Each structure stands twice: as C-alpha cells, then as structure tokens.
Amino acid sequence: MTALKVGSESWWQSKHGPEWQRLNDEMFEVTFWWRDPQGSEEYSTIKRVWVYITGVTDHHQNSQPRSMQRIAGTDVWQWTTQLNANWRGSYCFIPTERDDIFSAPSPDRLELREGWRKLLPQAIADPLNPQSWKGGRGHAVSALEMPQAPLQPGWDCPQAPETPAKEIIWKSERLKNSRRVWIFTTGDATAEERPLAVLLDGEFWAQSMPVWPALTSLTHRRQLPPAVYVLIDAIDTTHRAHELPCNADFWLAVQQELLPQVKAIAPFSDRADRTVVAGQSFGGLSALYAGLHWPERFGCVLSQSGSYWWPHRGGHQEGMLLEQLNTGEVSAEGLRIVLEAGVREPMIMQANQALYAQLHPLKESIFWRQVDGGHDALCWRGGLMQGLIDLWQPLFHDRS
C-alpha cells in the first residue's frame, strides 16, 4: 500500500480527529492535527496553534502552555502527548498570529489564567472531530474519550424524549431580572409524588449538551424514577458570579417565585428527600449552600467540581461554607450529598477533599467520587446522571 504524502488532500481525508497508539496497559500516545487554511509557512500568518486540553494543558495545571508544531513546507500542524487509557476530556485549538503570549519561561498560575483569558475567545473546535459543542466559557470544544474511559449512564444509549422540554420566562421581582427556565418531565408517575431536580447552568444542559435523551433513557431503564427537571439559565457570567456563590436572595427567589410557577405547569413532590439541587463549579457550591441553609426544601445535593475555595481564590484560606460547617453555623445532618471532583483540577480537588473530610462522620449519606478529568462538562455529564441515580435510589425501595 502506497504511503500518503503528508499534507496531501488524500492524507487529510484519512484524518478524523486525534489518533492514538497504545504504549502499555495504562497509557496511549495521542496525536492532534490541525490544517492551516492559509497553507504552508510561506503563505500563512499563523505563528502559534495553542492546544487547550481541559485538565491537561489548561491553567489548572500550572504548567507551560503547549503549542502545535508545523511540519515544514505543509499546511499541517501537529502535537503529541500521552494520556491515560481511561481519560476523557474536551479540547480546542487556538490559532493565533501573536507570539508574545506566554513568553515567560515559567509563567505562574495567574499569568497562565490571564494568558488563556486573552486567547480563548479565538478558540475553535477540532474541524476533524464531529463531536463538538459550545463550552461553558462560550468557545467551541471537541470531545476525546480514550478506549477505557468509564461508562457514562444514559449517554451510552440515549433515547428521544416523548415530549419536549417546555421553555418559560421567569421574571423575578426579588432579583430584578428575567431569564429562561426549562421544565422537563419523564415517566407517568402520579404527578404530586414526582421527585424534583433543579439543575443550575440550565442553558448549558438544555442547549449546548442537552440532557433530555440521557434522562429519558435512564427513566425507561428504571434507573431513574419519573421526575420533574427544572433547568435555570444563569443569564450571563456576571449574573452567574453574583447569584450562584452563596447568595440567599437567589435561593429565596427560586423557592418563593420560580417553584410555584413551575408547579402550576408540572406538579412535583414537596418532600426534601425527593428534591435534588445539582450544579458544577459555582453551581456545585450553590447546590450545597441551598441544602445547608434550606434542608427542609432541598434534601439532596449533587455537587461537581464545587468551588469551595470561595471567596478566597488563591486556595490559601478555607472557603466560607467550610468555615460555617466548622463553627457549627450550618449542619449537613440529614442531607444526602454527591461530591465529585477531578484529579486534574488541583485547587478544586483540594477544597473538595477538605469538605469531604469535614462531612466524613456522615459517610453513610455522602457519595464521594474522584474523576480522572478536569473542570470539564464532558466529565460532568456522566457524574450528573450517576449522581441522580445514587440520590434517588431510596425512592425505588419506597415503591417496592
């Protein structure tokens, strides 16, 4: 068989995203490709193609950023790394004409964060990879799942929902703003007995990575009970940063304004042990805050990559919720909690481990999971479904 010439049209047609080769039982060598639309270095103004892999080359790692290398005389850029056989994560490319970002030999964490902040608006998904979506920061990303990545319940065999989600507008008097909210129901249980799940960052789970097929699949397979799901839009990053971190007004508005509006459309149970609040990052922090402060309404908490360092970003001080738990101002007694964090997000993992240690005396009702991943929705989507399964498992015993 004749080898294809690197950079030829037929060579590019043979590429369908990252390629990998097994090194041993635990590791793969993975190569990423990008085609320069301007052609070779003779014609192109592209100086760098940064590779942003969540949990591998992002600012959480405090490591030197990685740039692809051009194969001389071609339109081919490539970069090779090694990944665990069970790794899963998202990535994007950032082609740029600038060569002055990350110029320091070993940038510190804040320099890295600032550099990526400048670059990420230019990020693109991998054109060779059909699995792409708009990430939480607003830029396109693509999926990479290694051969032994853990099963993600519901996402492995999605099913089309019988009825679409209903989108409403919630006009809040308390918060003085308006936002979209999605209401989704599954199954055919008695309406007043249906458990309720409140999902934060609802626009992501409704539009960028819709959860409806996974929820429908798990309900049909009797891994989840028939339920009502309420997905709350964060509006934008400014509102999100104000409303989600430990904000009483937000949760009072949810309880006093939004939930009655939802209940008129899709009735659900008022029981705290049937009610889940789920969120990621600031949303994870917010979910636990809601459970700790209104346990009579929110009895189940699903927190993924929760920002428990807040409000001290440096990670050198205990976060506010940890302080409140330590002083006894709040108690997790009676709550069922899923706590999940990625080993590739060090500061968040450290804060979550400290929280888990604080909650450990209640270990019978705490589900603690470490994930081989970063601050990444591709990891969160599996944990979100598994968390709902774990938190609602007692409901199946109630019905038997």
Curated annotation (Swiss-Prot):
Stated EC number for the protein is 3.1.1.108
| Pfam families xrefs | Enterochelin_N (PF11806), Esterase (PF00756)
Gene Ontology molecular function, alphabetical: enterochelin esterase activity; iron ion binding
Q: Which keywords does UniProt give here?
A: Cytoplasm, Hydrolase
What family does this chain come from, according to its entry? Belongs to the Fes family.
This chain's protein is named Iron(III) enterobactin esterase
Q: Entry's Gene3D superfamilies?
A: alpha/beta hydrolase, Immunoglobulins
What is known about what this protein does? Catalyzes the hydrolysis of ferric enterobactin (Fe-Ent). Is responsible for the release of iron from ferric enterobactin. Also catalyzes the hydrolysis of iron-free enterobactin (Ent). Hydrolyzes ferric monoglucosyl-C-Ent (Fe-MGE) poorly and does not hydrolyze ferric diglucosyl-C-Ent (Fe-DGE) or ferric triglucosyl-C-Ent (Fe-TGE) at all. Also hydrolyzes apo MGE, but catalyzes the hydrolysis of apo DGE very poorly, and does not process apo TGE at all. The catalytic efficiency for processing Fe-Ent is much higher than that for apo Ent, suggesting that Fe-Ent is the physiological substrate.
Q: Which reaction does it catalyse?
A: Fe(III)-enterobactin + 3 H2O + H(+) = Fe(III)-[N-(2,3-dihydroxybenzoyl)-L-serine] + 2 N-(2,3-dihydroxybenzoyl)-L-serine; Fe(III)-enterobactin + H2O = Fe(III)-[N-(2,3-dihydroxybenzoyl)-L-serine]3 + H(+); Fe(III)-[N-(2,3-dihydroxybenzoyl)-L-serine]3 + H2O + H(+) = Fe(III)-[N-(2,3-dihydroxybenzoyl)-L-serine]2 + N-(2,3-dihydroxybenzoyl)-L-serine; Fe(III)-[N-(2,3-dihydroxybenzoyl)-L-serine]2 + H2O + H(+) = Fe(III)-[N-(2,3-dihydroxybenzoyl)-L-serine] + N-(2,3-dihydroxybenzoyl)-L-serine
Compartments it resides in: Cytoplasm
Set out the biological process GO terms recorded for this chain's protein. Answer: iron ion transport
- Give yes or no: UniProt keyword Hydrolase: yes
SUPFAM superfamilies (alphabetical): alpha/beta-Hydrolases (SSF53474), E set domains (SSF81296)
Q: Which GO terms describe its cellular component?
A: cytoplasm
